[in-house]
Amino acid sequence: MRLLVLAALLTVGAGQAGLNSRALWQFNGMIKCKIPSSEPLLDFNNYGCYCGLGGSGTPVDDLDRCCQTHDNCYKQAKKLDSCKVLVDNPYTNNYSYSCSNNEITCSSENNACEAFICNCDRNAAICFSKVPYNKEHKNLDKKNC
């Protein structure tokens, strides 16, 4: 019985850890829209204390603060009535957006949850584009957080 409960928790955790490839690719696409020369999944994953899975401690710089704000935005989204756990949550929900001339527009056809999540990702991508990238903070040992 304990193994069954553990398996269920791991399945839920995997879904909430951002493993939905389409949702991840949407955020990736927004970052590429604002920073065309970037490789978002390589550049920003495991940067500082907040960029990537999880996050804790004190952000190490402005870019890390962008990630902390993004994490907090997702936490707010999960509290919305329109964002149901496991159905419409920030880590698994897909939304519609467009990119033109390095400008991101979230579609007016998104439902309330999709619109909120789209704007979380949009604001993070804009934030990333406005702050410096410090290579010393990539793969930072989390004990420094």
UniProtKB/Swiss-Prot annotation:
Role this protein plays: Secretory calcium-dependent phospholipase A2 that primarily targets dietary phospholipids in the intestinal tract. Hydrolyzes the ester bond of the fatty acyl group attached at sn-2 position of phospholipids (phospholipase A2 activity) with preference for phosphatidylethanolamines and phosphatidylglycerols over phosphatidylcholines. May play a role in the biosynthesis of N-acyl ethanolamines that regulate energy metabolism and inflammation in the intestinal tract.
PROSITE patterns, per the entry: PA2_ASP (PS00119), PA2_HIS (PS00118)
Protein name from the UniProt record: Phospholipase A2
Uppermost EC category: hydrolase
GO molecular function: bile acid binding; calcium ion binding; calcium-dependent phospholipase A2 activity; phospholipid binding; signaling receptor binding
Entries under InterPro entries matching the protein: PLipase_A2, PLipase_A2_Asp_AS, PLipase_A2_dom, PLipase_A2_dom_sf, PLipase_A2_His_AS
S-S bridge residues: 33-99, 49-145, 51-67, 66-127, 73-120, 83-113, 106-118
Enzyme Commission numbers on file: 3.1.1.4
Subunit field text: Monomer or homodimer.
Co-factor: note: Binds 1 Ca(2+) ion per subunit.
One Gene Ontology cellular component: cell surface
GO biological process assignments: antibacterial humoral response; antimicrobial humoral immune response mediated by antimicrobial peptide; arachidonate secretion; defense response to Gram-positive bacterium; fatty acid biosynthetic process; innate immune response in mucosa; lipid catabolic process; phosphatidylcholine metabolic process
A Pfam family that the UniProt record links to this protein: Phospholip_A2_1
Catalytic activity: a 1,2-diacyl-sn-glycero-3-phosphocholine + H2O = a 1-acyl-sn-glycero-3-phosphocholine + a fatty acid + H(+); 1,2-ditetradecanoyl-sn-glycero-3-phosphocholine + H2O = 1-tetradecanoyl-sn-glycero-3-phosphocholine + tetradecanoate + H(+); 1,2-dihexadecanoyl-sn-glycero-3-phosphocholine + H2O = 1-hexadecanoyl-sn-glycero-3-phosphocholine + hexadecanoate + H(+); 1-hexadecanoyl-2-(9Z-octadecenoyl)-sn-glycero-3-phosphocholine + H2O = 1-hexadecanoyl-sn-glycero-3-phosphocholine + (9Z)-octadecenoate + H(+)
Annotated binding of Ca(2+), by residue: 50, 52, 54, 71
Signal sequence segment: 1-15
Active site: 70, 121
Main location: secreted
Processing after translation: Activated by trypsin cleavage in the duodenum. Can also be activated by thrombin or autocatalytically.
Propeptide: 16-22
Superkingdom of this protein's organism: Eukaryota
Species the sequence originates in: Bos taurus (Bovine)
Modified residues (Pyrrolidone carboxylic acid): 16
